[in-house]
Amino acid sequence: MKDHSPRKPEWLKQRLSAGDGFGALQRLLSSKGIHTVCRSAKCPNLQECWSEGTATFLLLGNVCTRTCRFCAIDTSRTPAAPETDEPERVAAAARTMALQFVVLTSVTRDDLPDGGAAHWVETIRAIRKASPRAGIECLIPDFAGNEAALDLVCKERPDVLNHNIETVPRLYEKVRPEARYRRSLDLLQRAASLFGLTTKSGMMVGMGESFEEVGEALQDLARHGCRMITIGQYLQPSARHIPVERYVTPEEFAGFRDLALSLGFSSVQSGPFVRSSYHAAASSAACTPVP
């Protein structure tokens, strides 16, 4: 696919420099064979977060069964079986890093009957055993609409249950054809209403959506009980991914933030480099408890 993306504006040009903690964290994760979404998804904040000693752990391997056209993670219909010792390795890494807030995510595993939900449960329990004071945010897939699988994770009562809608409904067929917008909204509503969890979602902009469409999606999320939101600029990972339609200005991101706050979101992160787990601990702390 030929790259037709517009030229990057000045506000998206980063000066990258690795801090003292970057190398130590890289060695720790490598030694334990742990995957991170930071590296697998080519996150632009990798050096900043790793230098500060934080990372988002990627569960169930680093190969996804879906082919979302914005995502840099490798794909296959038949990925390797989950590693049974991964929960303990992740928990050990979180303890070594002395994390006060642990962010977990995973690839989508449509090849597994429960979508990997039992593996999620084992990981949450292992972290709580190793680091009982640590908060946990779970950025989960949609489990193909399997409510029993979703309930397994919700029953572990993570501090934040995160699931990204990613984009506006009009662009789903183009951007993430194997997902369903309504399914994602229903997931968030079930976690919030049935289990009383603090729910969070995220969107990328710059793929052809309008401001009004983003506003409508934010209203949908608010109506379905979502209380935290992240909004960031889509950046094309490679020439085979969908191109950037436009670069959203910092002023527009401020507008998204103001709109989300007016709709009742308790925590809003909106900016060019914002990603799902960016400043996750601070966002969780800023979110008022569920009544």
Curated annotation (Swiss-Prot):
Residues where [4Fe-4S] cluster 1 binds: 38, 43, 49, 277
Subcellular location: Cytoplasm
Catalytic activity: [[Fe-S] cluster scaffold protein carrying a second [4Fe-4S](2+) cluster] + N(6)-octanoyl-L-lysyl-[protein] + 2 oxidized [2Fe-2S]-[ferredoxin] + 2 S-adenosyl-L-methionine + 4 H(+) = [[Fe-S] cluster scaffold protein] + N(6)-[(R)-dihydrolipoyl]-L-lysyl-[protein] + 4 Fe(3+) + 2 hydrogen sulfide + 2 5'-deoxyadenosine + 2 L-methionine + 2 reduced [2Fe-2S]-[ferredoxin]
Keywords: 4Fe-4S, Cytoplasm, Iron, Iron-sulfur, Metal-binding, S-adenosyl-L-methionine, Transferase
InterPro entries: Aldolase_TIM, Elp3/MiaA/NifB-like_rSAM, Lipoyl_synth, rSAM
Cofactor entry: [4Fe-4S] cluster
The keyword S-adenosyl-L-methionine is annotated on this UniProt entry: yes
NCBIfam families: lipA, PRK05481.1, PRK12928.1
This protein's pathway: Protein modification; protein lipoylation via endogenous pathway; protein N(6)-(lipoyl)lysine from octanoyl-[acyl-carrier-protein]: step 2/2
SMART domains assigned: Elp3
One GO location term (cellular component): cytoplasm
Protein name as catalogued: Lipoyl synthase
GO MF annotations, alphabetized: 4 iron, 4 sulfur cluster binding; lipoate synthase activity; metal ion binding
A Pfam family recorded for this sequence: Radical_SAM
Organism per entry: Chlorobium luteolum (strain DSM 273 / BCRC 81028 / 2530)
Entry's transmembrane regions: none
Domain Radical SAM core: 50-266
Entry annotated with the keyword S-adenosyl-L-methionine: yes
Annotated family: Belongs to the radical SAM superfamily. Lipoyl synthase family.
Binding site for [4Fe-4S] cluster 2: 64, 68, 71
EC code(s) of this entry: 2.8.1.8
Cofactor note: Binds 2 [4Fe-4S] clusters per subunit. One cluster is coordinated with 3 cysteines and an exchangeable S-adenosyl-L-methionine.
